[in-house]
């Protein structure tokens, strides 16, 4: 298998178009998109969040995901055989927010709507769309959890994290399914992280 590296800014339509054009030139088709770009924002009260920060999070987490899905759908509809699979990276924050996370939480709720709309609108074209909601995978984004993170009750506590390889395995299993089968939503998280009952 050949790897193709294409630097891109998912928040810019032209950059996304170039990314998918390069993909089509290199491989001739697109079978799976893992829609994974995302970022957070500083944990501050709502009234202190700069609108520029809000827009940056929305541009990456929602607009970027839309632009990548849109480009993938164009390819998947046009190719023969038609179809493919889109896996959107949601978050457990699509179900239960953390304190002071309005921008991130709002975009992850919106990703769920994006996933459902793609599933409905693209079903006639053999395009399956699912979402994986990840909680506390051990990445750079979650390193701060080892030192303690703000909880809904105002306390700060360490939270367990899981090996990100387990997430990769879950995504690979979703991607491997035949197109007549779909995991619509999957939640994967560190077993003892505060999620059920959070808040």
Predicted regions and their residues:
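Active-site helix of classical SDR
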Residues: 69, 107
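C-terminal helical subdomain
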Residues: 131-132, 151-197
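The beta1-alpha1 cofactor-binding region of Rossmann-like NAD(H)/NADP(H)-dependent oxidoreductases
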Residues: 7-19, 51
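Substrate-binding pocket helix/loop in short-chain dehydrogenase/reductase
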Residues: 44-46, 53-58
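Residue(s) in the substrate-gating loop at a strand-loop-helix junction
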Residues: 91
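Alpha-helical segment proximal to the catalytic Tyr-Lys
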Residues: 74, 120-121
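Active-site loop immediately N-terminal to the catalytic Tyr-X3-Lys motif
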Residues: 47, 96-102, 159
């Amino acid at each position: 298998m050949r790897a193709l590296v294409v630097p891109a800014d998912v928040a810019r339509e032209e950059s996304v178009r170039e990314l998918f054009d390069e993909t089509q030139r290199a491989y001739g088709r697109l079978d799976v998109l893992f829609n994974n770009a995302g970022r957070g924002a500083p944990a501050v009260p709502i009234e202190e969040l700069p609108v520029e920060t809000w827009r940056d999070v929305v541009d990456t987490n929602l607009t970027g995901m839309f632009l990548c899905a849109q480009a993938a759908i164009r390819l998947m509809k046009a190719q023969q055989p038609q179809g493919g699979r889109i896996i959107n990276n949601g978050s457990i924050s699509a179900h239960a927010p953390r304190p002071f996370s309005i921008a991130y939480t709002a975009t992850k709720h919106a990703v769920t709507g994006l996933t459902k709309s793609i599933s409905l609108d693209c079903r006639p074209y053999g395009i399956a769309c699912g979402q994986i909601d990840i909680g506390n995978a051990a990445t750079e984004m979650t390193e701060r959890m080892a030192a303690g993170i703000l909880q809904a009750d105002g306390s700060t506590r360490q939270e367990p994290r899981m090996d990100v390889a387990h997430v990769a395995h879950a995504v690979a299993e979703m991607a491997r399914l035949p197109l007549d089968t779909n995991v619509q939503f999957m939640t994967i998280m560190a077993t003892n992280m505060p999620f059920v009952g959070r808040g």
